[in-house]
């Protein structure tokens, strides 16, 4: 479960797209900014987002909501920008986050295609090889 700025919640299973890219990030993380820029600059990912085939969930797994809210304008409006209320991800070890940033690529049924990825090129290669 994730929480949006207005307080509304959602789940991964509520995301209706062929693929979901869960991008775990922190507001003051330089590497996170680089990866965000690479996702935005990727012709493949941009086209898939535009076509509704890929949804990006930018998920902040920590509890400093002041920093997260201040950083929100930097996240593209076409992405879901959310945080983990109560820091359940880390407390309950819902994801094996070895480092931030990290990306998980999920298919339509939310099966994991990539875990702990930190290279946008790797995500592009995986998506490029998937059946249309």
Model-derived features: where do they sit?
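N-terminal "domain-start" segment that seeds a small globular fold
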Residues: 1-14, 125-128
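Hydrophobic beta-strand positions
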Residues: 1-2, 24, 105
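Structural microenvironment flanking redox-active thiols in thiol-disulfide oxidoreductases
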Residues: 33-73, 87-93
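Short active-site neighborhood of thiol/selenol oxidoreductases, capturing the structured segment around
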Residues: 10-39, 55-59
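Non-catalytic, surface beta->alpha helical segment in thiol-disulfide oxidoreductase systems
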Residues: 98-132
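Short acidic-hydrophobic, aromatic-tinged amphipathic segments that line or gate anion-handling sites
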Residues: 2-4, 80-85, 116-117
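Short, internal strand/loop/helix patches
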Residues: 69-104, 108-109
């Amino acid at each position: 479960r994730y929480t949006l700025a207005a307080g509304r919640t959602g789940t991964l299973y509520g995301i209706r797209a062929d693929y979901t890219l869960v991008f775990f990030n922190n507001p003051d993380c330089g590497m996170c900014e680089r990866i965000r820029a690479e996702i935005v600059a990727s012709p493949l990912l941009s086209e898939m987002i535009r076509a509704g085939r890929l949804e990006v969930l930018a998920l902040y797994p920590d509890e400093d909501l002041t920093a997260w809210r201040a950083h929100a304008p930097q996240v593209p409006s076409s992405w879901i920008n959310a945080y983990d209320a109560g820091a359940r991800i880390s407390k309950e070890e819902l994801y094996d986050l070895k480092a931030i940033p990290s990306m998980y690529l999920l298919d339509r049924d939310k099966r994991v295609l990539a875990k702990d990825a930190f290279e946008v090129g790797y995500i592009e290669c995986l998506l490029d090889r998937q059946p249309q």
